[in-house]
């Protein structure tokens, strides 16, 4: 189950990276970008924990949040 959800999430993230992201200006304040962070988190921790980490990261990515290098733990 976790494997299938991971593949589904990775597919959705890749769709965003290749089809939607090029149409909007870059805004991510971190490296790696939030979408790349999500890919790495899902690959490393699986669908549930990876998605939780990605959501927390996206919630921190705003003008008043942090910035800089923030790798997947």
From Swiss-Prot:
Keyword Membrane assigned: yes
Signal peptide start-end: none
Membrane topology, record value:
Peripheral membrane protein
Q: What is its main location?
A: membrane
The entry's cellular-component GO terms read: plasma membrane
Q: Does the keyword Chloroplast apply?
A: no
What InterPro entries does this protein map onto?
A: Membr_insert_effic_factor_YidD
The places in or outside the cell where this protein is found are:
Cell inner membrane
Keywords for this protein = Cell inner membrane, Cell membrane, Membrane
Family stated for the protein in its record: Belongs to the UPF0161 family.
Q: What does this protein do?
A: Could be involved in insertion of integral membrane proteins into the membrane.
Q: Name the HAMAP family on file.
A: UPF0161_YidD (MF_00386)
Report the protein name in the record. Answer: Putative membrane protein insertion efficiency factor
Species of provenance? Neisseria gonorrhoeae (strain ATCC 700825 / FA 1090)
Its lineage opens with: Bacteria, Pseudomonadati, Pseudomonadota, Betaproteobacteria, Neisseriales
